[in-house]
């Protein structure tokens, strides 16, 4: 092992992430870099090259960060090794951004020339500044007729505090300016400073499970060297393993003889249990260990909780195993077993937001072929009991009876909404309707305002983002953070089917809205629950008091009217759709309840409740 050669190799490494607001073109820029450097052949090249999860390609968004090694021949005649990490832009996946930045010395901060700086641009820049990274501003989509480069530069300087005079001006679509941008990476982003001769110290920033190789750990080597045959130790657990393979993603796995300080790659060591490695752990040499582990990641607590149950109770163990494998690859997912009288055995899962919840459900159904029932999402409430103790309520059905607690507290957030001047009125109206308290309003420039409200998290997570987009014609962005818990007049609303309470349909609401929401819920369930052979009585109740009611009439005796569908193809389609729907039904008592019914609380928009 020639130390001088390794040191020279290390000097030519550049580790950087691409971060931006959602839809500002990060993945397209990554595609152009792969194309320009011949990392991927023209035949293999496709849009969103680094988005290798089928769900990412379906939705057209980045969900998981992804790293790739790129070789670049610079204008100075030298060859450089780029480790490029593409990151998500949606607020739900901000934890992926913070993890990826820990593996980098620099970041490309991409801003859409037609939209300017947005909420997640600000949030991601602050994370990069906290990590002491070299930030290179990149102005993308300069080929658009609506691109305003001088204005975007002004915003970058005023709002982000970065020097934009030398900002790279690129088009991810056409490839214009990409090579100049890569030259800036060579010149401005520092090489990693790790000590190759020190004991091995590597940070696990991601991992996934492979049926043949076991756990595949994505790592940034901070110090030292690692190669196949080495004995390594996970510092958090103390467990030791023998390295079977090391390599890099380019973008498909490529084996290497060794990884050195500064490299971003992967390690396999025949680790079969998903519990034995955790994102944020430090790997060291078992025979010559480092003394201090690397600073791991701040664990981000879930914002939203939902019950997850297999449609077929026999799939419980398969669901548990699938969640464990997914958790390895998704550090923000939390789950613990729970039992529902209506749905049987399942899990209470914690997510960072509704998009995160949707993605987890779709991945479980697509990648593990599971049929699932999800209950309506809820936030974490605190019940202050009569004896002064605090009970954490992440499932509405667990809220004690009224006489057993002094008060209920709910989480509040500071919501920052960036919006065009023309839409400030509708945004303030929306926030007030959602129980928001106005804090301040900052005029960022002639066109845009940053509006800040304190709001209950429960009001944000359901349909707030959709309502915000519709009330501003899409010209608004949102960022929020939890600020603490406040005492609020909340009540639990139970839903009864034929006088039998269904725990999975319970929800918590502000007392002033309780009756409206209960009425909305019962009428929604009346539409969603199919007719049965008997009458179904749907009731909403606070304690013993019934506050809303709806009735589903039974089938008529003669059901043959169904088969007189004119078009036989249409009839076949309807039957197939009905068959799929029945798979996602649960018998609650004698009543068949579809998946949609458990999510009905999401459909209770404010406008409907207020009769607008």
Curated annotation (Swiss-Prot):
It catalyses: GTP + H2O = GDP + phosphate + H(+). InterPro entries: EF-4, EFG_III/V, EFG_V-like, EFTu-like_2, LepA_C_sf, LepA_CTD, LepA_IV, P-loop_NTPase. GO terms for molecular function: GTP binding; GTPase activity; ribosome binding; translation elongation factor activity. GO terms for biological process: positive regulation of translation. Residues 11-193 form the tr-type G domain. The keyword Phosphoprotein does not apply. It is a peripheral membrane protein. Keywords: Cell membrane, GTP-binding, Hydrolase, Membrane, Nucleotide-binding, Protein biosynthesis. Belongs to the TRAFAC class translation factor GTPase superfamily. Classic translation factor GTPase family. LepA subfamily. Required for accurate and efficient protein synthesis under certain stress conditions. May act as a fidelity factor of the translation reaction, by catalyzing a one-codon backward translocation of tRNAs on improperly translocated ribosomes. Back-translocation proceeds from a post-translocation (POST) complex to a pre-translocation (PRE) complex, thus giving elongation factor G a second chance to translocate the tRNAs correctly. Binds to ribosomes in a GTP-dependent manner. HAMAP family: LepA (MF_00071). NCBIfam families: lepA, small_GTP. This is Elongation factor 4.
């Amino acid at each position: 092992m020639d130390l001088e050669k390794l040191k020279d190799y290390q000097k030519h490494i550049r580790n950087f992430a691409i971060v931006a607001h959602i839809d500002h073109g990060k993945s397209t820029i990554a595609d152009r870099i792969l194309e320009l450097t011949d990392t991927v052949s023209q035949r293999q090249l496709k849009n969103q090259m680094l988005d290798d999860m089928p769900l990412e390609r379906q939705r057209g968004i980045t969900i998981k960060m992804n790293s790739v090694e790129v070789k670049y021949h610079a204008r100075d005649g030298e060859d450089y090794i780029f480790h490029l990490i593409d990151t998500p832009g949606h607020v739900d996946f901000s934890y992926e951004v913070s993890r990826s930045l820990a593996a980098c010395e620099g970041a490309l901060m991409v801003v859409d020339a037609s939209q300017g700086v947005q909420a997640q641009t600000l949030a991601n820049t602050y994370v990069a500044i906290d990590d002491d990274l070299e930030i290179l501003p990149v102005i993308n989509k300069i080929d658009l007729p609506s691109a305003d480069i001088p204005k975007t530069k002004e915003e970058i300087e005023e709002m982000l505090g970065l020097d934009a005079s030398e900002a790279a001006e690129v088009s991810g679509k056409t490839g214009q300016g990409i090579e100049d941008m890569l030259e800036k990476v060579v010149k401005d982003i520092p090489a990693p400073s790790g000590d190759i001769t020190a004991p091995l110290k590597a940070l696990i920033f991601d991992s996934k499970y492979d049926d043949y190789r076991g756990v595949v750990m994505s790592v940034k080597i901070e110090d030292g060297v690692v190669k196949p045959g080495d004995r390594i130790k996970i510092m958090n657990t103390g467990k030791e393993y023998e390295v079977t393979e090391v390599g890099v993603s380019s973008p498909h796995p490529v084996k290497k003889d060794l990884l050195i300080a500064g490299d971003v790659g992967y390690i396999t060591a025949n680790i079969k249990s998903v519990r034995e490695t955790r994102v944020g752990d430090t790997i060291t040499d078992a025979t010559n260990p480092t003394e201090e582990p690397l600073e791991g990641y701040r664990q981000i607590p879930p914002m939203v909780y939902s019950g997850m149950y297999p449609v077929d109770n026999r799939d419980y163990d398969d669901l548990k195993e699938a969640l464990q494998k997914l958790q390895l690859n998704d550090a923000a997912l939390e789950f613990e077993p729970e039992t529902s009288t209506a749905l049987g055995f399942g899990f209470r899962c914690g997510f960072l937001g509704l998009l995160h919840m949707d993605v987890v459900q779709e991945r479980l159904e697509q990648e593990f072929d599971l049929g699932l029932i999800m209950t309506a999402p809820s936030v974490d409430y605190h019940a202050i009991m009569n004896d002064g103790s605090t009970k954490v309520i992440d499932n509405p059905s667990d809220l004690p009876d009224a006489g057993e607690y002094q008060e209920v507290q709910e989480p509040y957030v500071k919501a920052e909404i960036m919006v065009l001047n023309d839409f400030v009125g509708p945004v303030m109206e929306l926030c007030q309707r959602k129980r928001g308290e106005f804090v301040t309003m900052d005029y960022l420039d002639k066109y845009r305002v940053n509006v800040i409200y304190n709001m209950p998290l429960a009001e944000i997570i359901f349909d707030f983002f959709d309502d915000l987009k519709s009330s501003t014609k899409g010209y608004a962005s949102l960022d929020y953070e939890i600020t603490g818990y406040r005492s609020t007049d909340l009540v639990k609303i139970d839903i009864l089917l034929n006088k039998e309470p269904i725990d999975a349909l319970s929800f918590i609401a502000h007392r002033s809205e309780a009756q409206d929401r209960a009425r909305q819920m019962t009428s929604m369930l009346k539409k969603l629950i199919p007719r049965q052979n008997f009458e179904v009585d749907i009731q909403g109740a606070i304690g013993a008091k019934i506050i809303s009611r709806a009735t589903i009439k039974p089938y008529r005796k003669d059901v043959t009217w169904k088969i007189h569908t004119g078009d036989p193809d249409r009839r076949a389609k309807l039957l197939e759709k009905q068959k799929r729907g029945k798979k996602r039904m649960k018998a609650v008592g004698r009543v068949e309840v579809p998946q949609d019914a458990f999510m009905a609380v999401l459909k209770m928009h404010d406008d409907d409740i207020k009769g607008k």
